[in-house]
Amino acid sequence: DDCGTLFSGCDTSKDCCEGYVCHLWCKYK
């Protein structure tokens, strides 16, 4: 999953947070 626009919404979308890149982004957010 590319989280829609890669990072946009990663902080609110739980599915995106589960992703490899978004998960790291969520962690540092």
Curated annotation (Swiss-Prot):
Disulfide bonds join C3-C17, C10-C22, C16-C26. It is found in: Secreted. GO terms for cellular component: extracellular region. It holds the Pfam family Toxin_12. It comes from the Eukaryota. Keywords: Calcium channel impairing toxin, Disulfide bond, Ion channel impairing toxin, Knottin, Neurotoxin, Potassium channel impairing toxin, Secreted, Toxin, Voltage-gated calcium channel impairing toxin, Voltage-gated potassium channel impairing toxin. Expressed by the venom gland. The keyword Cytoplasm does not apply. The keyword Zinc does not apply. One of its GO terms (molecular function) is calcium channel regulator activity. The presence of a 'disulfide through disulfide knot' structurally defines this protein as a knottin. Belongs to the neurotoxin 10 (Hwtx-1) family. 19 (HpTX2) subfamily. Inhibitor of voltage-gated potassium channels of the Kv4/KCND family. Blocks calcium channels (Cav). This is Kappa-sparatoxin-Hv1e. It comes from Heteropoda venatoria.
